[in-house]
């Protein structure tokens, strides 16, 4: 079955979540996130926010991230340390399987992802989730 999405229309349905933090409860996130289509073992997800996401990782596969509007800094924690990537509208990144990552978008971002499930989130403000969970 083919799924066709009008990305502009889908993003217009979302409201901008301002002041997002890693600890933002689901009630704050309501209306700023959508899962418009399934994809393989996960889904296509859309988000519209300004602030800082929770750290997350995907143990079963890579995540494809595309910035549709705005900008974000994508932080990845690797064996070499913390890496940062500045992403603006029209750019994408592939986050490797099981890699902790976080989005920081002080001025706001509209992002679409192809995300495998399950996703592990760490909803506390830490510099490195590995020190809390893996170490």
Place the predicted regions along the sequence by residue:
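Short histidine-centered beta-strand/loop micro-motifs
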Residues: 35-38, 54-59, 76-77, 84-86, ...
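Flexible, glycine-rich phosphate/dinucleotide-binding loops
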Residues: 73, 81, 120
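Short acidic-glycine-tyrosine-enriched beta hairpin
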Residues: 78-97
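Short, conserved beta-strand element in jelly-roll/cupin
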Residues: 48-50, 58-78, 114
